[in-house]
C-alpha cells in the first residue's frame, strides 16, 4: 500500500516537500510525490490507496489511474480543485479554526479600509495632495453600512460575526438552510431571496463554496442588483465571478470597487486588466492561509485512517461539493 502526494501550482513546499514531511511523521509508510508538471514521469500508481492532492491533473483520481484508491485528502479547506472521484471514494478537507479567524480579520480590515477611504488617502499621498475633504464627502460610519455575507459555513459565519462585532449591520445569504446565520444577522436563503439580499448590501463578501450551482454566479445581472457604488470582496473562488461582467460594472461606476483575493487563473496573469484597474485591489490568495502544522497533523491522521481501514475525519459531502 502506498500514499501519493500531488501538488500543482499551490506554492509552498510542493509535492516533494510535503511527501518528505509525511515520511518523517509516519515512518514506514510508502509516500510518493508527483508534481504533475508536463513531461514529469509519474511514480507507480497501481498500489496507491490514499492521495493527498492540490489541483491534481484531470483524470488522475479515476479508477483507471488509481485502481486501489480508498481515500482522498485535500491540502486545503476547499475541494473544488479536486475534480471527479470514483463512486464511493471519500474526500476530506482541512479544518483549521484559526483559518476562519484569519479570513474574518482580512474581510473586516478591507471593509473598514473601504468605508474609511484608506486607498483614496494613499493615492493622495502619492500625489502629495492633502485630501481632508474626503472625510466629510465619502467616509461612512460603520453603523450605517450594511455588509452582506454570502455563505454561512465556518468562514462565512466567522466573517459575519466579526463584521457585526465592529458595528456593521450584517445580513447573510445561503443557498440552503443547512446552517443558520450568527445571532443578530438578518438571514436570506435561496434564489428567491437573493435579489432582496443584494439590494441592501453596501459591501458584499463572497464566501460561498464553488459548486456547479454557484459557478459564474457573480455576473452582470447579479451585479446590477447591488446598490450603486457597492464594494465587492471576493475571498472564495475566482470561478464564482464572470470577470468581464465585473470589469464592466467597475468601469461604469456601477460598482464602487473590489478587493479580489482569488482568480480563475493563479497566479493572476501579468496582462490581466485587474492589475491596473484603479477600483481593484489585488491580493495573491492570502486571505486565510492554512497553518502548516494544523494541516500536517490532519493529513497524517487521515492518511493513517485510510491505511488502517478507518473512516477519515472532516469528510466532504461530495454530491454537494462542500
PLM features: what roles do these ranges have?
Residues 177-273:
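Rossmann-like adenosine-cofactor binding region
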Residues 122-158:
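Glycine-rich NAD(P)-binding loop of Rossmann-like domains
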Residues 93, 99-106, 120, 124, ...:
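C-terminal helix-to-coil terminal segments
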Residues 46-126:
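Phosphate/diphosphate ligand-binding glycine-rich loop within oxidoreductases
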Residues 51-53, 74, 205-206, 234, ...:
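Redox-cofactor binding/interface segments in oxidoreductases and associated redox assembly factors
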Residues 60-68, 83-88, 223-228, 249-254, ...:
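Short, conserved loop/helix-junction motifs that constitute active-site signature segments
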Residues 1-50:
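N-terminal glycine-/charge-rich "phosphate-binding" loop or analogous flexible N-terminal tail
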Residues 165-183:
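NAD(P)-binding Rossmann-fold cofactor-contacting core
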Amino acid at each position: 500500500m502506498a500514499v501519493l502526494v500531488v501538488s500543482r501550482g499551490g506554492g509552498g513546499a510542493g509535492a516533494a516537500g510535503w511527501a518528505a514531511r509525511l515520511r518523517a511523521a509516519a515512518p514506514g509508510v510508502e509516500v510518493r510525490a508527483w508534481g504533475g508538471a508536463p513531461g514529469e514521469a509519474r511514480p507507480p500508481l497501481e498500489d496507491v490507496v490514499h492521495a493527498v492532492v492540490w489541483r491534481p491533473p484531470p483524470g488522475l483520481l479515476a479508477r483507471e489511474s488509481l485502481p486501489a484508491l480508498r481515500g482522498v485528502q485535500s491540502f486545503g479547506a476547499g475541494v473544488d480543485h479536486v475534480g471527479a472521484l470514483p463512486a464511493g471514494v471519500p474526500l476530506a478537507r482541512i479544518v483549521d479554526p484559526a483559518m476562519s479567524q484569519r479570513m474574518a480579520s482580512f474581510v473586516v480590515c478591507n471593509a473598514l479600509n473601504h468605508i474609511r477611504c484608506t486607498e483614496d488617502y494613499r493615492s493622495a499621498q502619492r500625489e502629495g495632495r492633502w485630501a481632508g475633504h474626503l472625510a466629510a464627502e465619502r467616509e461612512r460610519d460603520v453603523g450605517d453600512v450594511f455588509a452582506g455575507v454570502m455563505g454561512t459555513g465556518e468562514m462565512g459565519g466567522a466573517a459575519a460575526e466579526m463584521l457585526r462585532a465592529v458595528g456593521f449591520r450584517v445580513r447573510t445569504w445561503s443557498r440552503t438552510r443547512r446552517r443558520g446565520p450568527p445571532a443578530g444577522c438578518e438571514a436570506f436563503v435561496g434564489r428567491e431571496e437573493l435579489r432582496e439580499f443584494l439590494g441592501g448590501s453596501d459591501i458584499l463578501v463572497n464566501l460561498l463554496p464553488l459548486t456547479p450551482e454557484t459557478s459564474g454566479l457573480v455576473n452582470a445581472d447579479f451585479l446590477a442588483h447591488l446598490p450603486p457604488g457597492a464594494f465587492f470582496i471576493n475571498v472564495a473562488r475566482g470561478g464564482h465571478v464572470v470577470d468581464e461582467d465585473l470589469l464592466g460594472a467597475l468601469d461604469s461606476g456601477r460598482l464602487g470597487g473590489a478587493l479580489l483575493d482569488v482568480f480563475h487563473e493563479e497566479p493572476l496573469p501579468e496582462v490581466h486588466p485587474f492589475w491596473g484597474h484603479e477600483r481593484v485591489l489585488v491580493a495573491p490568495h492570502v486571505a486565510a492561509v492554512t497553518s502548516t502544522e494544523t494541516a500536517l497533523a490532519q493529513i497524517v491522521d487521515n492518511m493513517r485512517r485510510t491505511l488502517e481501514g478507518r473512516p477519515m475525519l472532516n469528510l466532504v459531502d461530495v454530491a454537494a461539493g462542500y
